[in-house]
């Protein structure tokens, strides 16, 4: 009975650690998934933007001479509310403007590439919310309608699904005219350095860590998980101490029979190992079962490296 109680406690706490870790990783991924798809080395923002893509604007004269081959791509970004023409089903999204032949262009899993003006590619999380191929969407209350011609996956930024469109369409949406050649950032695929007055080049890891709210969220979950791991060790230690104290007379008999102290200590550690392994194994099975029943909209992602 006592050993079953130890296994149950290890199982419950380990399951909570795994569950919180999965939520933490899932939320963190939603902030950065679209950025990870680029497999880029760095990003160039306006210096005043304080490492924040949302606040960055690059004028044509600042970036036009920086393009060198296919390793640098222009990116436009704006937040958007998408809805149907009748005003129903408002959905929050992020809009990325890009050139369809750049390395920033998303992989399409359903539908076709955008070929005409005002055609867009959307992350499949919008599909989960009811958006279908061929749907016409308004963005930020615009009179212009944007047709969804394809879906991509694993493209979210700031926890919101991304809608991809051509740069000229983006400029018309954000600045009111495609003649305004502003962009939000330059994304650099290779390791080249860009030094230009008024611009700031950041590594992708530095840029991601400065996404508003990203770092506090990661730290909060990390402290919670660390505290639960510490509690697990404390509880396990207390249980094993109590069980060991209760068996003191038995260990005395074993010593009287000539059994070495090292073997007795080893047996205690083997008990701890077996009970812990059993509890952790049950927690892993419970986590796999949980993953099967959770809705797709839940930011839950199993990452065994995080558990380790």
Could you describe each region identified by the protein language model?
Residues 29-82, 92-94:
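Membrane-proximal extracellular/periplasmic loop immediately following the first transmembrane helix
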Residues 273-308:
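Short helix-loop junctions at transmembrane helix boundaries
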Residues 142, 151-228:
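Mechanotransmission and gating elements of multispan inner-membrane complexes involved in transport
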Residues 12-19, 23, 232, 236, ...:
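Hydrophobic alpha-helical membrane-associated segments
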Residues 1-18, 211, 269:
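N-terminal Sec/SRP start-transfer signal
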Residues 76-78, 91-99, 106-169:
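Hydrophobic secondary-structure segments that place a key small or acidic residue at a functional site
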Residues 195-249, 253-254, 265-269, 273-274:
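Peri-transmembrane interface segments
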